[in-house]
Swiss-Prot record:
A Pfam family that the UniProt record links to this protein: Hormone_recep
DNA-binding region: 102-177
Biased composition (Low complexity): 34-47
Annotated zinc fingers (NR C4-type), start-end: 105-125, 141-160
NR LBD domain segment(s): 210-434
Keyword Zinc-finger in annotation: yes
Region (Disordered): 1-64
Gene: ESRRG
UniProt GO MF annotations: nuclear steroid receptor activity; sequence-specific double-stranded DNA binding; steroid binding; zinc ion binding
Protein name per its UniProtKB record: Estrogen-related receptor gamma
Top-level division of the source organism's lineage: Eukaryota
Compositional bias per record (Polar residues), positions renumbered to this chain: 10-29
PROSITE patterns associated with the record: NR_LBD (PS51843), NUCLEAR_REC_DBD_1 (PS00031), NUCLEAR_REC_DBD_2 (PS51030)
Length: 435
């Protein structure tokens, strides 16, 4: 199979990359791909954490993180919220960390207006749920009862939207059936979807309980797709393939930093610990994404929907050994029938379980790990009661993921040393930090 310059409709136009010489445009990318749309981006890791923008060759801005390499002069930093010039990068760091991400609706991913019927949700989904219950409305999905519910598509399938409301934990007992405004009923925090008179029984699987709230949050926080957009005017070669992958990885890194800020508990860690975790686990997160996208393919790796590598392309790019290692992970997760809920939770666990030696507050990081482990266990207990060991089996895949990540980092670091492939500041800096 040759490189696929697949058709991408106009809805994807906001994700089209720019040339490697203009990394400042990653600001647009992170605003699109970060779930809350509030994360900033730049050409280097420390400036990405702080909302600064640097050129491709600008030095790192965070002086207290020597593992990033080079302190460099303090540059003038423009605050996004005013026209004043901020001279101190540490001040900007604190500003960005204090800009907590907004709470998201667990049903569609829009900005939540508060907790409605037991769940963080937006006004639109609150009103939809209330109308459905009060009107005793039955819906039927025209497809397979698996429609994706997002802010943009939440009106496309009422049946799947209502099922999503129940799945994330909205409580039908909280809706007043008499349509009278006033005090709220007291109700138990549970869902008995199988007994609901408002659902077609064929649409519901009665044995399953609602998702763990952390898992639901991670599903909503999952970023939009990023496209590789390989240059169709350049002939296929190892340099073209590696340049495409390095550019893609750089843009994915920006998105990962924005995504991490939406993991419950991550933004409460110190800046130094956030940096340490990301510097340690970023490649594991990237590889896990490739693995998940590749589950429905045979012996091919889906680096992006428009960039799929088979064995011949892997050989051409000099990536055969690395890609074979990643395919072993694909095979393992495919045999386990990895679900999206497990994928997003494993990504967060991989970040929290990093092997960094530079953690300041070990107790806080341990607490984050415990919360995420419990979320996975709770999900498996509710969705896979037939396999009580499934959570443990999932966690046992992480050592192989880390081993594969180490191989990938070393391979791309060697490419960096050769100097034949252009790399953005952020990707280059993260390779340095990991090695």
């Amino acid at each position: 199979m040759s490189n696929k310059d697949r058709h991408i409709d106009s809805s994807c136009s906001s994700f089209i990359k720019t040339e490697p010489s203009s990394p400042a445009s990653l600001t647009d990318s992170v605003n699109h791909h970060s779930p809350g749309g509030s994360s900033d981006a730049s050409g280097s890791y420390s400036s990405t954490m702080n909302g600064h923008q640097n050129g491709l060759d600008s030095p790192p801005l965070y002086p207290s993180a020597p593992i990033l390499g080079g302190s460099g002069p303090v540059r003038k930093l423009y605050d996004d919220c005013s026209s004043t010039i901020v001279e101190d990068p540490q001040t900007k760091c604190e500003y960005m960390l204090n800009s907590m991400p907004k709470r998201l609706c667990l049903v569609c991913g829009d900005i939540a207006s508060g907790y409605h019927y037991g769940v963080a949700s937006c006004e639109a989904c609150k009103a939809f749920f209330k109308r459905t219950i009060q009107g005793n409305i039955e819906y039927s999905c025209p497809a397979t009862n698996e429609c994706e519910i997002t802010k943009r598509r939440r009106k496309s399938c009422q049946a799947c939207r209502f099922m999503k409301c129940l799945k994330v934990g909205m409580l039908k007992e909280g809706v007043r059936l008499d349509r009278v405004r006033g005090g709220r009923q007291k109700y138990k925090r549970r869902i008995d979807a199988e007994n609901s008179p408002y659902l077609n029984p064929q649409l519901v699987q009665p044995a399953k309980k609602p998702y763990n709230k952390i898992v639901s949050h991670l599903l909503v926080a999952e970023p939009e797709k990023i496209y590789a957009m390989p240059d169709p005017t350049v002939p296929d070669s190892d340099i073209k393939a590696l340049t495409t992958l390095c550019d893609l990885a750089d843009r994915e890194l920006v998105v990962i930093i924005g995504w991490a800020k939406h993991i419950p508990g991550f933004s409460t860690l110190s800046l130094a610990d956030q940096m340490s975790l990301l510097q340690s686990a970023w490649m594991e997160i990237l590889i896990l994404g490739v693995v998940y996208r590749s589950l429905s393919f045979e012996d091919e790796l889906v680096y992006a929907d428009d960039y799929i590598m088979d064995e011949d392309q892997s050989k051409l790019a000099g990536l055969l050994d690395l890609n074979n290692a990643i395919l072993q992970l694909v095979k393992k997760y495919k045999s386990m029938k990895l679900e999206k809920e497990e994928f997003v939770t494993l990504k967060a666990i991989a970040l929290a379980n990093s092997d960094s030696m530079h953690i300041e507050d070990v107790e806080a990081v341990q607490k984050l790990q415990d919360v995420l482990h419990e979320a996975l266990q709770d999900y498996e207990a509710g969705q896979h009661m037939e396999d009580p060991r499934r959570a443990g089996k999932m966690l046992m895949t992480l050592p192989l993921l880390r081993q594969t990540s180490t191989k990938a980092v070393q391979h791309f670091y060697n490419i960096k040393l050769e100097g034949k492939v252009p790399m953005h500041k952020l990707f280059s800096e993260m390779l340095e930090a990991k090695v």
